[in-house]
Amino acid sequence: MADFLKGLPVYNESNFSRFHADSVCKASNRRPSVYLPTREYPSDQIIVTEKTNILLRYLHQQWDKKNAAKKRDQDQLEIGETSAPPRKIARTDSQEMSEDT
């Protein structure tokens, strides 16, 4: 088993030559950072978390934003702007493509 562990960095004493136990103690003497609120909130305020998953909520919001334009276009068509030509035009080369395959 010694041959298996031979040459690993753990056996190299110079890896720990810059480590000083005193420096660890000095770092722990620093004061921890503390949050100081900038506004006063009522003490009887109750914070309630939402039941839905954050990812699901985000995806629903993105879907709503994406489909808002489609919904708006559909509403305009229902109002009476049906005389406007459609934005999409049928492909004329679709028959040629099916014949090639």
From Swiss-Prot:
Residues 67-101 are annotated as: Disordered. GO terms for cellular component: Cul4-RING E3 ubiquitin ligase complex. Pathway: Protein modification; protein ubiquitination. It comes from the Eukaryota. GO terms for biological process: protein polyubiquitination; regulation of proteasomal ubiquitin-dependent protein catabolic process. Keywords: Ubl conjugation pathway. The keyword 4Fe-4S does not apply. Functions as a component of numerous distinct DCX (DDB1-CUL4-X-box) E3 ubiquitin-protein ligase complexes which mediate the ubiquitination and subsequent proteasomal degradation of target proteins. In the DCX complexes, acts as a scaffolding subunit required to stabilize the complex. Component of numerous DCX (DDB1-CUL4-X-box) E3 ubiquitin-protein ligase complexes which consist of a core of DDB1, cullin-4 (CUL4A or CUL4B), DDA1 and RBX1. Belongs to the DDA1 family. This is DET1- and DDB1-associated protein 1. It comes from Xenopus tropicalis (Western clawed frog).
